[in-house]
Amino acid sequence: MATSLSSAPTQLRPSPSPSHHRLLHRSSLLPFPRRHHHRRRRCGALSIARASASAKDGVTVRRFPAAPTEGGRLAGVRKIMILGAGPIVIGQACEFDYSGTQACKALAEEGYEVVLVNSNPATIMTDPDLAHRTYIGPMTPPLVERIIAAERPDALLPTMGGQTALNLAVSLADSGALDRLGVRLIGASLPAIRAAEDRQLFKQAMDRIGLKTPPSGIGTTLEECISIAEDIGEFPLIVRPAFTLGGTGGGIAYNRAEFEDICRAGLAASHTQQVLVEKSLLGWKEYELEVMRDMADNVVIICSIENIDPMGVHTGDSITVAPAQTLTDKEYQRLRDYSVAIIREIGVECGGSNVQFAVNPADGEVMVIEMNPRVSRSSALASKATGFPIAKMAAKLSVGYTLDQIPNDITKKTPASFEPSIDYVVTKIPRFAFEKFPGSEPVLTTQMKSVGEAMALGRTFQESFQKAVRSLETGFAGWGCAPIKELDWDWEKLKYSLRVPNPDRIHAIYAAFKKGMRIQDIHEISFIDKWFLTELKELVDVEQFLISRGLDQLSKDDFYQVKRRGFSDTQIAFATSSSETDVRLRRLALEVAPTYKRVDTCAAEFEANTPYMYSSYEYECESVPTNKKKVLILGGGPNRIGQGIEFDYCCCHASFALREAGYETIMMNSNPETVSTDYDTSDRLYFEPLTVEDVTNVIDLERPDGIIVQFGGQTPLKLALPIQQYLEDKKLVSASGTGLVKIWGTSPDSIDAAEDRKRFNAILEELGIEQPKGGIARSESDALSIASEVGYPVVVRPSYVLGGRAMEIVYNDEKLIKYLATAVQVDPERPVLVDKYLIDAIEIDVDALADSVGNVVIGGIMEHIEQAGIHSGDSACSLPTRTVSAKCLDIIRSWTTKLAKRLNVCGLMNCQYAITTSGEVFLLEANPRASRTVPFVSKAIGHPLAKYASLVMSGVTLPELGYTQEVVPKHVSVKEAVLPFEKFQGCDILLGPEMRSTGEVMGIDYEFSGAFAKAQIAAGQKLPLNGTVFLSLNDLTKRHLAEIGRGFRELGFNIIATSGTAKVLQLEGIPVEPVLKIHEGRPNARDMLKNGQIQVMVITSSGDALDSKDGLQLRRLALAYKVPIITTVDGARATIDAIKSLKNKSIETLALQDYFQTTDASQNLQAAQSAS
């Protein structure tokens, strides 16, 4: 007879308490120490630290006088300008759309007129109905000053837009613009910003209140930095630039050469050409505290966060846990007192701040690392972890309210001055994209490199950790119980992966435990606290227990104990050699199902009015589903390259529209950065992994009328077929009783038809739609045969990808064979698509909208600036098109309409076309879902396409919406991609078919040249109006050289070029100065770049691989010296037009509302809501 988990004394055994269970081990039969499973403080007492508090531990505190107010509001303030964060970049992602959106709503709620400045069209905050005036364009001091002069706001709030907004505010103050225009800074004063961001001033402030900082010095030149390093006396050293984002330009130096390289980069990246050189605290533990202060000098601690990775890894790249788990209560109180003293000393009078500490695990010594005097990435995490809306509260504090005057939105009974108390554990794990940047080393340092993150909540650390791993969507259903590659590594390789921080270190820990390494040994190599390692070792022991049992031997109690440790059905299936379906059926037969707990800010001491849920395997369920009409919207999970904020934007619009139309909306997502996971975006929020198991659990509980899968990108689309199969098997009746639960919009079968190459080819042939010649290869010989038939170059990619993953243009058999062997491992189960690459073709993007009765409307037709072959997500594009003939546009409209009808699209569809130089049109791909261009198109045409699409899915027709024909605006909108190359040393910056951009900006003007110029400036590309241009074009593009050369000469630029390019220009009669290539001698192009003799570079490559070493070096050097670099001919043409526009006229600044003469671009929704 099988022994159960709960009955065998020689097996793993839980303690009686379900929420504080421990495991017993064979070896000791003693419970492992479980220190601070969660920290819970009572909500009853007013948890405010006041200035009258006496100094503790040698820490002194200061009081600042409160600003004058009018009944809780700042005197004389009626109109407020909010600065956004600009495009999504590494270190500054959609958490600032979340904070900016909260701030806009909070201030409008208080009756203020809000003016918003932001360059990112993919944000909710830039919707024209959120602020009274919305400016989408470059965020540079001169242009923002002109907007301030036009709008005349009374105050400027810079603390909601990350480092971008803070630096911009400092520049405006330093230039005297704010004083000249009578604008006051709110949220954080200029002295407070300087004291926190300026490394020297911060260090002095800490010295004044008796707090330690690491031994360090401030350098403004390389020579000063070297002198500081000599004074400190030993490597490794940490370099931290001032006024930068995500540790940009910083790093860890282990020797003199590395140190000098990092210092050069740091000085160039710093807003003030200042870096902090400090002694390394590698191996110390790192903690963060989120702090808020009001004008009456009340201070509350919102949340403590602990980094599992020790010091040396940027907190954005570290796995973090809230509340802190390994602090004693005395240690926590000490950090709390220090945080209060710091926020007062720095002078943040009203709003939130993030304070980071290092603690020596040997003796408890504490050092202060840094402080952010603004809403930060950690603030968003703390908000989602606790349910306390930090950004909203910070916005209200900035206009004079005190914490005890602001009600808690979740409880409705407590004020914001009650510190949140939580009875669960939150784990955040970052997501990386090193595979997108070949040549870059996957090592984590003080410079942030992650592109997204997933968060999970559980009653224990183990449960939340496993759910967070599952939420990452990197192929793991949890931690362990999988055939990971690290199990095959030798000891040296495994130890290296444990010692050197990297994205896969958690899997190396699993492999080390499986191979028999002890907790102490892993701790000594990795410096990860033994408490966390003990928790992880228990999970390995539970897995071993499962392996020793068959599925049918697991009792109900066994299931509960295993599920409470976060194990998914997939993991249990792997360990018990069964299938996920078998596990689910067995679990449900034993009546083991998750319950849902509420995030309520007060550990259940008060009733929560806002249903914000997470799952756990306990006995009481706090989710109370209704029998109203309702819709479940599946989000996009963690941000990644190819699937980012644009999809979250669509999910939010679906929730807004359907709530307005009378539906109860339920959001399910795992991304803490987003607006979709804000507590008030939907009627109910389930913060859960997006897997078949977790989604079907919510479906079983809620039984919604509809499920929306087409807005969250590839994540929910991959779930569509298994969810459809589940619904067909279960035949669940919706809670409202109006019919069966079903997937709304385009059917999963139609989605599959568009993704399956064979089915899709048959549909195109039936409709008479042309596509590039190509085929499906299931072996190397297949691929070579197809390439021979269609002719090189060819585009090769795996089927079912998003963001051009593993896509490449290859030019010969040798490169194709290498691609098949290294990039995709082609076989019959993993076919590869091989298509003819259309040289010099123009690429077109189309977003269309279709309803359930066959009406189709073109939302927008965009023309890419770069040629076909560069991923659409990395290419700039314009709307309307500028060079496409009416005939080609008619073909595109006809084919898009026919395809939407044939696929029975209900909702959004995106199509991509290529137009050859001879005017032939080819369809490249079609996606019956929301695309990443939907927010851009919506802003460009003044119609909220995602809102329309969600209403269409509910049964409203396009005529009922009043949206029946394509809108072609009089103005021109240009979208430009923002790329993160400066974060990935060693990788080339050439663009290709694999997407690598992290974000986007938008420029709007009545001429293309002006719109393109605005987009370039907004993306950080400084366009010079004169100087010297360096030209180096490869043989494929030299035929365009004369045109490009003449264009720059007509603008007054001098031209320098490498020998081959110079000869072509001289033959065309264009003046040019030849320059040596790097390998030809000196002075060469590299020397001229370093000497500041080159203002703009045009340098192309064949794109079949990294080109000559010279080209790679020059491109990387141009990036380091912030010289604009253009890598395509079409990009060079557009840049010439843009510079001409900038020379001929000043940049015009208009609000989005001015282009549409309305303050609400979604007014057509009124008819739809009444119709539905």
Curated annotation (Swiss-Prot):
Disulfide bonds: none annotated. Residues 203-399, 761-954 form the ATP-grasp domain. Residues 1021-1162 form the MGS-like domain. It is found in: Plastid, Chloroplast. It comes from the Eukaryota. Binds 4 Mg(2+) or Mn(2+) ions per subunit. Belongs to the CarB family. This is Carbamoyl phosphate synthase arginine-specific large chain, chloroplastic. It comes from Oryza sativa subsp. japonica. The lineage of its organism: Eukaryota, Viridiplantae, Streptophyta, Embryophyta, Tracheophyta.
